[in-house]
Amino acid sequence: VILGSAGMRIVTAGDMVCFAGISGGLNVSIKNDYNITVLRGQSVSEILLSPEKIGYTGIESPTVVLALSDEGVARRQKIFAALSPDTYVLKEASVAIPGTPAQVEELDFKAMKIKKTDWALASLAVLAKHEIVLNKDMLVFALKSRFNEKLFNLSMETVDKLI
Protein backbone atom coordinates (compact mmCIF):
# COMPACT_ATOMS: atom_id res chain seq x y z
CA VAL A 1 0.00 0.00 0.00
CA ILE A 2 1.43 3.39 -1.02
CA LEU A 3 0.04 6.35 0.93
CA GLY A 4 0.76 9.76 -0.53
CA SER A 5 -0.72 12.99 -1.81
CA ALA A 6 -1.72 14.31 -5.19
CA GLY A 7 1.31 15.23 -7.30
CA MET A 8 3.62 12.71 -5.63
CA ARG A 9 3.40 10.22 -8.52
CA ILE A 10 1.83 7.57 -6.29
CA VAL A 11 -0.17 5.99 -9.13
CA THR A 12 2.99 5.83 -11.25
CA ALA A 13 4.83 4.13 -8.39
CA GLY A 14 1.97 1.64 -8.12
CA ASP A 15 2.33 0.95 -11.84
CA MET A 16 6.06 0.37 -11.31
CA VAL A 17 5.35 -2.24 -8.63
CA CYS A 18 2.94 -3.97 -11.02
CA PHE A 19 5.45 -3.98 -13.89
CA ALA A 20 8.11 -5.29 -11.49
CA GLY A 21 5.79 -8.05 -10.29
CA ILE A 22 4.95 -9.08 -13.84
CA SER A 23 8.67 -9.24 -14.65
CA GLY A 24 9.00 -11.68 -11.74
CA GLY A 25 6.21 -13.89 -13.09
CA LEU A 26 3.60 -12.74 -10.56
CA ASN A 27 -0.07 -11.93 -11.00
CA VAL A 28 -0.88 -8.32 -10.14
CA SER A 29 -3.83 -6.17 -9.17
CA ILE A 30 -3.91 -2.45 -8.45
CA LYS A 31 -6.58 -0.14 -7.04
CA ASN A 32 -6.02 3.61 -6.88
CA ASP A 33 -7.84 6.14 -4.71
CA TYR A 34 -7.44 9.84 -5.42
CA ASN A 35 -9.53 12.99 -5.61
CA ILE A 36 -10.65 14.27 -8.99
CA THR A 37 -9.48 17.74 -7.97
CA VAL A 38 -6.08 18.26 -9.57
CA LEU A 39 -3.13 18.35 -7.13
CA ARG A 40 -5.31 18.19 -4.02
CA GLY A 41 -5.93 15.49 -1.45
CA GLN A 42 -4.76 11.96 -0.92
CA SER A 43 -3.36 9.55 -3.47
CA VAL A 44 -3.35 5.88 -2.48
CA SER A 45 -2.35 2.78 -4.44
CA GLU A 46 -3.17 -0.70 -3.18
CA ILE A 47 -1.17 -3.34 -5.05
CA LEU A 48 -1.47 -7.11 -4.82
CA LEU A 49 1.32 -9.36 -6.07
CA SER A 50 0.76 -13.11 -6.00
CA PRO A 51 2.08 -16.25 -7.66
CA GLU A 52 -1.55 -17.47 -7.54
CA LYS A 53 -4.51 -16.17 -9.53
CA ILE A 54 -6.00 -13.13 -7.75
CA GLY A 55 -9.72 -13.50 -7.13
CA TYR A 56 -10.35 -11.03 -4.30
CA THR A 57 -8.59 -7.70 -4.75
CA GLY A 58 -9.08 -6.37 -1.23
CA ILE A 59 -6.05 -6.01 1.02
CA GLU A 60 -6.74 -7.19 4.55
CA SER A 61 -3.18 -7.20 5.87
CA PRO A 62 -0.52 -5.59 3.68
CA THR A 63 3.06 -6.84 3.63
CA VAL A 64 4.42 -3.35 2.96
CA VAL A 65 3.13 0.17 3.64
CA LEU A 66 4.87 3.25 2.25
CA ALA A 67 3.77 6.27 4.32
CA LEU A 68 4.76 9.32 2.28
CA SER A 69 2.24 12.00 3.26
CA ASP A 70 -0.09 12.83 6.13
CA GLU A 71 -3.05 13.01 3.71
CA GLY A 72 -2.49 9.46 2.50
CA VAL A 73 -1.99 8.17 6.04
CA ALA A 74 -5.20 9.90 7.17
CA ARG A 75 -7.10 8.16 4.37
CA ARG A 76 -5.98 4.69 5.55
CA GLN A 77 -5.18 5.35 9.23
CA LYS A 78 -7.20 2.37 10.46
CA ILE A 79 -4.85 -0.16 8.83
CA PHE A 80 -1.89 0.71 11.05
CA ALA A 81 -3.23 -0.81 14.29
CA ALA A 82 -4.06 -4.04 12.45
CA LEU A 83 -0.67 -4.50 10.78
CA SER A 84 1.28 -7.59 11.75
CA PRO A 85 4.76 -7.43 13.32
CA ASP A 86 6.05 -8.85 10.01
CA THR A 87 4.73 -5.89 8.01
CA TYR A 88 7.38 -3.43 6.80
CA VAL A 89 6.44 0.26 7.00
CA LEU A 90 8.66 2.82 5.31
CA LYS A 91 7.82 6.25 6.67
CA GLU A 92 9.11 9.59 5.48
CA ALA A 93 10.46 11.58 8.44
CA SER A 94 7.93 14.40 8.05
CA VAL A 95 4.94 12.03 8.15
CA ALA A 96 3.15 11.06 11.37
CA ILE A 97 1.68 7.56 11.55
CA PRO A 98 -0.59 5.97 14.16
CA GLY A 99 0.85 3.39 16.54
CA THR A 100 1.52 0.05 14.89
CA PRO A 101 3.07 -3.31 15.78
CA ALA A 102 4.75 -3.32 12.33
CA GLN A 103 8.45 -2.81 11.68
CA VAL A 104 8.91 0.89 10.90
CA GLU A 105 11.87 2.39 9.05
CA GLU A 106 12.06 6.17 8.88
CA LEU A 107 13.95 7.98 6.12
CA ASP A 108 14.37 11.71 5.61
CA PHE A 109 14.11 12.10 1.84
CA LYS A 110 14.20 15.88 2.17
CA ALA A 111 17.60 15.71 3.89
CA MET A 112 18.77 13.39 1.09
CA LYS A 113 17.80 16.16 -1.36
CA ILE A 114 15.17 14.00 -3.03
CA LYS A 115 12.28 16.00 -4.45
CA LYS A 116 8.85 15.27 -3.01
CA THR A 117 7.67 14.16 -6.46
CA ASP A 118 10.34 11.42 -6.33
CA TRP A 119 9.64 10.11 -2.80
CA ALA A 120 7.49 7.23 -4.09
CA LEU A 121 10.21 6.15 -6.52
CA ALA A 122 12.83 6.53 -3.78
CA SER A 123 10.70 4.29 -1.55
CA LEU A 124 10.62 1.62 -4.25
CA ALA A 125 14.41 1.84 -4.45
CA VAL A 126 14.60 1.21 -0.70
CA LEU A 127 12.36 -1.84 -1.10
CA ALA A 128 14.60 -3.09 -3.91
CA LYS A 129 17.70 -2.51 -1.79
CA HIS A 130 16.24 -4.64 1.01
CA GLU A 131 14.74 -7.07 -1.54
CA ILE A 132 11.30 -6.62 -0.02
CA VAL A 133 8.61 -7.36 -2.64
CA LEU A 134 10.99 -6.49 -5.50
CA ASN A 135 14.68 -6.33 -6.32
CA LYS A 136 16.79 -3.90 -8.34
CA ASP A 137 16.50 -5.91 -11.58
CA MET A 138 12.70 -5.93 -11.28
CA LEU A 139 12.63 -2.19 -10.58
CA VAL A 140 14.94 -1.41 -13.51
CA PHE A 141 12.73 -3.54 -15.79
CA ALA A 142 9.66 -1.64 -14.62
CA LEU A 143 11.28 1.74 -15.21
CA LYS A 144 12.48 0.73 -18.68
CA SER A 145 9.01 -0.59 -19.54
CA ARG A 146 7.21 2.56 -18.46
CA PHE A 147 9.55 5.45 -19.32
CA ASN A 148 11.38 6.80 -22.34
CA GLU A 149 15.18 6.90 -22.16
CA LYS A 150 15.37 10.43 -20.71
CA LEU A 151 12.88 9.70 -17.90
CA PHE A 152 14.47 6.31 -17.27
CA ASN A 153 17.89 7.93 -16.77
CA LEU A 154 16.44 10.60 -14.47
CA SER A 155 14.65 7.91 -12.46
CA MET A 156 17.83 5.87 -12.17
CA GLU A 157 19.59 8.88 -10.62
CA THR A 158 17.08 8.72 -7.77
CA VAL A 159 17.28 4.92 -7.52
CA ASP A 160 21.09 4.97 -7.43
CA LYS A 161 21.07 7.41 -4.47
CA LEU A 162 19.38 4.72 -2.38
CA ILE A 163 20.74 1.39 -3.60
Show the residue positions of the predicted features:
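Active-site cofactor/cluster-binding pocket
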Residues: V1-I163
